[in-house]
Every structure is written in C-alpha cells, then in structure tokens.
C-alpha cells in the first residue's frame, strides 16, 4: 500500500500544475459576478423596460389571487437588496466595473418604473395583505446598502414616490416575530432619507430582539 501511495505521489509530481490547481481569488470573483448577472439580469432588464409583469414566469400552489402581485415585489425587493453592496462599489474601467455600471443604470431605471403609477410595472406597497411590508423592507435595505449608486442616482420625483410607497406599509401591523424587524428596516430607511420616522415601529422590533429574543452567538 505504501508503495502505491509513493508511486502516485511521484507520478503526480510530473503532472501539469493546473491539473490540481484551485481557483484563484480572481476566478472566484468572476464566477460570483457571472452568477449574480444570471440571477439579476432577467429582473432588472425587464423592470427597466417596463416588461417585468409581462415576461416574468409565475407558479404558485396558493389560491390567493394576490399571490401573483406579490411575486413581482418579491423579485424586485430581493434582487435590489442582494446586489446593492456590489453596485455601491460604483463603475470602474475594468471588465467587472463596466458590468457593474450597466446594472447600476438598469436598477435606477427599474426603480423609476416600479414606483411610477403610469408604468405597467408599477408596484403598490398597500395593505390589501401583509406581504408588502416584507418586500418594502428588502427594498429599503437595498437602498440603505447603496445610498450613492442607487438612492443618489434617482431623480427627486422617484425618491418622493419611493418614500410614499414605504410609508404605505405603516398601516400593516407586523406579526410578533422577525416581521417586527421588517417594520424597523422601513423606518430606518425613512429616517436616513427623510429624517422622519415612526418611533414605535423603528425601536419596538429592535428592542424586542435585543432584550427578549437574542441569546448570543446568533441564537434567538
């Protein structure tokens, strides 16, 4: 057995280094960017063109007629939240930087459509059901993560419309669970961008987690 192991080791030493090479940091990053584009591109391209509701596939086991409407907000909120830190790096004169520049522009135009009542992709964050609070929180977190490249690149009318949609969710009472933090996240964005917030909705969820539910080391 030892002889076999020794022989394999000797043979391996003559093989090209690339055969057992691990991906470099640059290769890893390129893969992650490629994956990001695959996920975000269908959402942002269609949203920017006003065709998200027209082209986005929809499947659901729920009989709730509002479920389809929810799916569009989920796609937009989670996409914006997920890619915002990357977008905030800003455009650069590199391959990745040019890709990033493209998606900053798509996201900004997409957000304009998402809150424009005249757009076919207008997303209403009303209280017909409770899910809009969750979707608004993801969108709010994305805007907080990219204050320069997203919020800072929006025109004042779009900013005002986003504020209006976020405030609509104040009529939704969060469940006594992690949903409390969804309300807190919305208010944190309103505080950041307008300097106005609902004290109860901002602090109640945060204090509930800190004082009653958080046990330490990510345990609740």
Predicted regions and their residues:
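Long, charge-dense tracts
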Residues: 95-96
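Aromatic-lined, polymer-binding surfaces characteristic
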Residues: 72, 83-86, 100-220
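Bacterial N-terminal signal peptides
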Residues: 8-18
